[in-house]
């Protein structure tokens, strides 16, 4: 895992963040990782190429919120997402994330406790995912 600190966003990181937020918000979200001391963006490589990224916001010394997590479509199913969660869980015993229906099973398989937040946006059910290391 590598901390992403470049002042300009690379095409690979731009693409990954766009999977987790709208295209219009990519630059704004990336800037938060550069400017805010409680936010960190990590990338992971597979076969020499950036294959995924995970961005967190530190809530306390023992808790963080996953703000973005994404893996390139061609690299999915290879354990890259789990590797990123393992890395974050090694640093923070308590992790929270908010996600949609498409990603909720990923968190559930990892051992997150899932709570429906209902329709936060018209037609879009959101879920709160909470993980506490035993």
Per-region residue spans from a language model:
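Short amphipathic alpha-helix that is part of the acyltransferase structural core
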Residues: 1-28, 45
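A short helix-loop-beta-strand connector motif used in the catalytic cores of GNAT acetyltransferases and
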Residues: 32-43, 65
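Conserved beta-strand in the GNAT
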Residues: 43, 49-58, 62-70
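Active-site beta-strand termini and strand-to-loop segments that position acidic
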Residues: 45-47, 131-133
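Conserved acetyl-CoA pyrophosphate-binding loop and the N-cap/start of the following alpha-helix
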Residues: 75-87
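Conserved active-site alpha-helix within GNAT-family acetyltransferase domains
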Residues: 82, 101-125
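Conserved GNAT acetyl-CoA-binding A-motif
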Residues: 90-102
């Amino acid at each position: 895992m590598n901390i992403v600190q470049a002042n300009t966003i690379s095409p690979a990181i731009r693409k990954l963040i766009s999977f987790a937020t709208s295209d219009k918000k990519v630059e704004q979200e990336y800037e938060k990782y550069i400017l805010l001391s409680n936010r960190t963006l990590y990338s992971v490589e597979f076969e020499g190429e950036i294959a995924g990224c995970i961005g967190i916001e530190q809530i306390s010394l023992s808790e963080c919120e996953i703000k973005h997590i994404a893996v390139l479509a061609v690299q999915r199913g290879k354990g890259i997402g789990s590797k990123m969660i393992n890395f974050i869980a090694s640093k923070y015993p308590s992790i929270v994330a908010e996600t949609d229906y498409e990603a909720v099973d990923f968190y559930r398989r990892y051992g997150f406790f899932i709570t429906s937040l209902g329709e936060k946006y018209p037609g879009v059910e959101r879920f709160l995912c909470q993980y506490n290391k035993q």
